[in-house]
Amino acid sequence: MATKGGREKIKLESTAGTGHFYTTSKNKKTMPEKMLIKKFDPKARKHVDYKEMKLK
């Protein structure tokens, strides 16, 4: 059985202020810095930056 614990669930929250977010996971060992990704925000109806936040 494979070992667990390498990946952590995160929330990508829109910087446009609409409150929209995506959830995903990332490997903390290979990518320790915070993610900043351009994705589509359906509430703003355009591509905006999404910042990594902690998933509660």
Curated annotation (Swiss-Prot):
Alphabetical list of InterPro entries matching this protein: Ribosomal_bL33, Ribosomal_bL33_sf, Ribosomal_zn-bd
GO (cellular component) term, any one: cytosolic large ribosomal subunit
Pfam families per record: Ribosomal_L33
PANTHER family, per the entry: 54S RIBOSOMAL PROTEIN L39, MITOCHONDRIAL, LARGE RIBOSOMAL SUBUNIT PROTEIN BL33M
Ranges of compositional bias, category Polar residues: 15-25
Family, similarity comment: Belongs to the bacterial ribosomal protein bL33 family.
Gene Ontology terms for molecular function: structural constituent of ribosome
Superkingdom, taxonomy of origin: Bacteria
Entry's Gene Ontology BP terms: translation
Compositional bias per record (Basic and acidic residues), positions renumbered to this chain: 1-12
Organism (species): Albidiferax ferrireducens (strain ATCC BAA-621 / DSM 15236 / T118) (Rhodoferax ferrireducens)
Region span, Disordered: 1-28
Lineage: Bacteria, Pseudomonadati, Pseudomonadota, Betaproteobacteria, Burkholderiales
UniProt keywords, alphabetically: Ribonucleoprotein, Ribosomal protein
Name of the featured protein: Large ribosomal subunit protein bL33
